[in-house]
Amino acid sequence: MKYIFVTGGVVSSLGKGVASASLGALLRARGYKVTAVKIDPYINIDAGTMRPYEHGEVFVTASGAETDLDIGNYERFLDLDIPPGSNITTGQVYLEVIRKERAGDYLSQTVQVIPHVTDEIKRRIRTAGENAGAEIVLIEVGGTVGDIESLPFLEAIRQFKFDEGDENVLYIHLTLVPYLGTSNEFKTKPTQHSVAELRSVGISPDIVMVRSKEKLPPEITRKIALFTSVRENRVFSSYDVGHVYELPLALEEQGLGKAVEDLLGLERTHPNLGVWQNAVRTLKHPNHEVTIAIAGKYTEMPDAYLSLLESLTHAGIANDARVNIKWVNAEELAEGDLETQLGDADGILVPGGFGIRGIEGKIKAAEYARTHNVPYLGICLGMQIAVIEYARHVAGLTGANSAEFDPYAPHKVIDLMPEQLEVEGLGGTMRLGDWPMELRAGTKIAELYGVPQGGTVRERHRHRYEVNPAYVGQLQDAGLVISGVTPGVQGRGAGLVESIEIPGHPFFVALQAHPEFKSRPMRPSPPFAGFVAAALQSGPSSAASGQTVAAEA
C-alpha cells in the first residue's frame, strides 16, 4: 500500500481537501484503487455537534459517520463511498488510548504521546486503507503546520516513511503565494518559511503545491524550488479556476499525476479524463440557465450547504444548464414580500436544518411553491416543513406543527421518533447513514429513480423527527401522496414516511433523506436532476426569450 500525506502551511482554508481530492481523481483515472483519510486535530469525537457557521456542513457517510465536509469532496471527486474510520480526530485517538490504558493493554507502561498516541494514529490510517482495499491512501492533515494541535499527527506521519520505506510514502505540502498588487509581484517568503517549519519536525516535502490567484510564472516556480530544495518539476500551481471540477485537469496539465507515479515507483499510465473534460465543458458553456431560491438560515455561510450546492451543480451538468443560486434568509421570509423574494425563482429548495429559527419563513416558502406551481424540493427538514404547511392549509389541521418547534401544538404532525425517547446525549445518536426507501409505483419519485413500477433505493439520513404516523391517514385523505416509506419499522403501520409529493403540481417532491450526500458530478442525485429539469420547464426563465446562454470565455 502507498501513502500520500498532504499538509498545509501559511494559513488555513487553503483548499487542501479539494487539491487532495483532485489528485485522487487523477489516480483513479489511471486505474488505481484509491481511498482518502481526513485528519482533524480537534478534540471532538466527530463533526456531528459542531456549529455550521464555524465548521460548515456535517457530511454523513453510508455507514452513518458524521464527518468533516472534505469527506464529501473525496466521495464526489473519487466517485466512491469512503469507508468507516476515514475521518480521524484527536478525540477519537485519545479516547482509544485512554481506554486501552484503563484496560491494561499497555502492561503498566508509562503512556506517552510517543509511542502510544502516534502508534494509534498510524494504526487508524493503515486500518482505513485496509478496509477500503486501497492501493493508494490519500491522507489530508487538517490545520496548519506549526499548530500545536497537529504535532502528534505530524510526528506519526514522519514515522511512516521510516516504517514503510521511501518508495511507499509521499509528502505533499500546500502553501500560499500571495500576490501584492502594490508591487506587482508574487511573494514566496511565506512558502519558504512554511517548508522550513515542516522540515523542523522532520518532514521534507517531495512535492510543493502552491495556492495562488493565477498560475505561477516559471521564474517564481524556480525560486520556490531553489529555496525549498524541491525540484522545479515537482512544484505545482493550484491556482484559482472557474469551478473546482477544473482543478484535476489543471493539475494533470502540469504533470502532477506523472510526478506522483515516479515518486512512488509506479509505472506511468495514461489517465482517462474524458468524463471530467465533458463535465467542465458543460459547466463553462451551458445552453440553458435556471435560478433556484434556497430558503435557509445559514445563508451567510454557503459551506453549511456544500453538498447541496454541489448536487445542484451536478444536476445542472445533467441538464446542460447553469444553476444560479438565490439565497433567501428564511427569517426575512416570515414577514417579507414573498413575491419580491421568490417571484423570480424557477424553483424553491428548503434544505435540512435544526431549531426553530426561520421555520415560519420556510413554511411560507413551501406554501408559495405549492400555490404558485413553482417546482419545490424539500430535503429532510424541508420535507417536514412541507407536511406542516399542507396540514395547516389543505388538511385543515389548524395549528399543526412539529414537536421540535412547539411541544404543545394541537396537531404534532411531525414528532420525535419513538426510538429517540430514551436517547441520552447528542453525538452520534440520530438516525444516521444509509436506509432503504420503498418507492410507490406511479409516483414522481419512483420515476426519478428509474423504478416507475416501484422499488427500493437507499439514501442517507440524519434526523430525529419524522412524520407522525397518527396523521398519515388524514394527510392522504387531503390529497398528499406518501410516495416512499421505510418498511418494517415498528409502530409505523405501512412504514416510516420517507418521501411525499403533491399530484398535479409541476414538481413538488420532498424527502426525509439527504440525497445530496450521494450525488456525484457524473451521477447526479435523481431528485436534484429532476428538480432542475422541472425548474427549466416551469419557471420564469423558461418563458424568457433567448434561453440559450452565451458561452463564457
Curated annotation (Swiss-Prot):
GO cellular component entries: cytosol
Catalyzed reactions: UTP + L-glutamine + ATP + H2O = CTP + L-glutamate + ADP + phosphate + 2 H(+); L-glutamine + H2O = L-glutamate + NH4(+); UTP + NH4(+) + ATP = CTP + ADP + phosphate + 2 H(+)
This protein's UniProt keywords: ATP-binding, Glutamine amidotransferase, Ligase, Magnesium, Metal-binding, Nucleotide-binding, Pyrimidine biosynthesis
Residues the record lists as binding ATP: S13, L14, G15, K16, G17, V18, D70
Entry binding sites for CTP: S12, D147, I148, E149, K187, T188, K189, P190, T191, Q192, K223
Tagged with keyword S-adenosyl-L-methionine: no
Active site, per annotation: C380 (nucleophile), H514, E516
Name of the molecule in the record: CTP synthase
Organism for this UniProt entry: Deinococcus geothermalis (strain DSM 11300 / CIP 105573 / AG-3a)
Name of the gene encoding the protein in the UniProt record: pyrG
